C-alpha cells in the first residue's frame, strides 16, 4: 500500500527549535539548534525513525559535517529526505516522497547502479525493486555477476553491499558477492534458526542486522576478528 506521509515531527527528540527555512536556504548546524550527535546516530542506526517522520515541522534544509561524513536533511514541509556522504563520495540515505514508494540507496547521482525498496505497508518486509535516480542505496559500480552453481546470486542489494565491503576490508567485491550469494541468496531479511541473519548471515554477537548498514558493520566486525574464516574460507 502506497503511503502519503505528512510531517509528524522528530523535533522534540532532536531538540530542533527556532528555525524556519525559506526556499533555497541551506542551513549548517550552527544556524539551528540541532543535536548533531543524535542525528548522526539516527542516520547510522535508526533509519526507520528518519524514514517515518521529518526532524522538525515545516520546511528545512540542514547540512553539516561530522566525523568525516556530510549529513543532509531536507523537507518542503510535506515530504522529506535525508542522506549522509563520506569523504570519498560514498553515500547512504533515504528519500521520502509523498505518494511514492520508499526508495533508498548508498550512493546518489547519475550512471549509478542503485537499489530501492518497495514498502507495501508500514509493517511489511522490504524487497528489492528497480532503482530510481534520487537518493538511493547503491554503490558507484555495477552489480556483481556472481552466480553459484545452485543458482544463488548476491542480488542488487547484496552486490552493492559487496562493493562497500571491498572498500572497507580490501577483499574483492566478487569474493563478498560470492559469500552473500552462498549465505543468503541476496535476501536482506534472511534468517537462520541458529541466529544468523542478514545478507552475510552474521551471528548476533557481531551486532544488529535490522538495516543494510548494520549488516555491513556486523560483517566488517566479523572479518576483522576472524577474517574470511568467519564464513568458512
Curated annotation (Swiss-Prot):
The keyword Hydrolase applies. Belongs to the transglycosylase family. IsaA subfamily. Keywords: Glycosidase, Hydrolase, Secreted, Signal. This is Probable transglycosylase IsaA. The keyword Disulfide bond does not apply. Is able to cleave peptidoglycan. It is an enzyme of class 3 (hydrolase). One of its GO terms (molecular function) is hydrolase activity, acting on glycosyl bonds. Disruption phenotype: Up-regulation of ssaA and sceD. Its inactivation shows no clumping and results in an apparent increased degree of cell separation which could be due to the up-regulation of sceD. Inactivation of both isaA and sceD genes results in a high degree of clumping and the double mutant is also attenuated for virulence. Induction: Increased expression in vivo during human sepsis. Highly expressed under biofilm conditions after 8 hours of growth. Positively regulated by SarA and the two-component system YycFG. Also positively regulated by the two-component sensor-regulator SrrAB under aerated conditions. More protein is secreted in a secG or double secG/secY2 mutant (at protein level). It is found in: Secreted. Its EC number is 3.2.-.-. The lineage of its organism: Bacteria, Bacillati, Bacillota, Bacilli, Bacillales.
Amino acid at each position: 500500500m502506497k503511503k502519503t506521509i505528512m510531517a509528524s515531527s522528530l523535533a522534540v527528540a532532536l531538540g530542533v527549535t527556532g528555525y524556519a527555512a525559506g526556499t533555497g536556504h541551506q542551513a549548517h548546524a550552527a544556524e539551528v539548534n540541532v543535536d548533531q550527535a543524535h542525528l548522526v546516530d539516527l542516520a547510522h542506526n535508526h533509519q526507520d525513525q528518519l524514514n517515518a517522520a521529518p526532524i522538525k515541522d515545516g520546511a528545512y534544509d540542514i547540512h553539516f559535517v561530522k566525523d568525516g561524513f556530510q549529513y543532509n536533511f531536507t523537507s518542503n514541509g510535506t515530504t522529506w529526505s535525508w542522506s549522509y556522504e563520506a569523504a570519498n563520495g560514498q553515500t547512504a540515505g533515504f528519500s521520502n516522497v509523498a505518494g511514492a514508494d520508499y526508495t533508498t540507496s548508498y550512493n546518489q547521482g547519475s550512471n549509478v547502479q542503485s537499489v530501492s525498496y518497495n514498502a507495501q505497508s508500514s509493517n511489511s518486509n522490504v524487497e528489492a525493486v528497480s532503482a530510481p535516480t534520487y537518493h538511493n542505496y547503491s554503490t558507484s559500480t555495477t552489480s556483481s555477476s556472481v552466480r553459484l552453481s545452485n543458482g544463488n546470486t548476491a542480488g542488487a542489494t547484496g552486490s552493492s553491499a559487496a562493493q562497500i565491503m571491498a572498500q572497507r576490508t580490501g577483499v574483492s567485491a566478487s569474493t563478498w558477492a560470492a559469500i552473500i550469494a552462498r549465505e543468503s541468496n541476496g535476501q536482506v531479511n534472511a534468517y537462520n534458526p541458529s541466529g544468523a541473519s542478514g545478507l552475510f548471515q552474521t551471528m548476533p554477537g557481531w551486532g544488529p542486522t535490522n538495516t543494510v548498514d548494520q549488516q555491513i558493520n556486523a560483517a566488517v566486525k566479523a572479518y576483522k576478528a576472524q577474517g574470511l574464516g568467519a564464513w568458512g574460507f
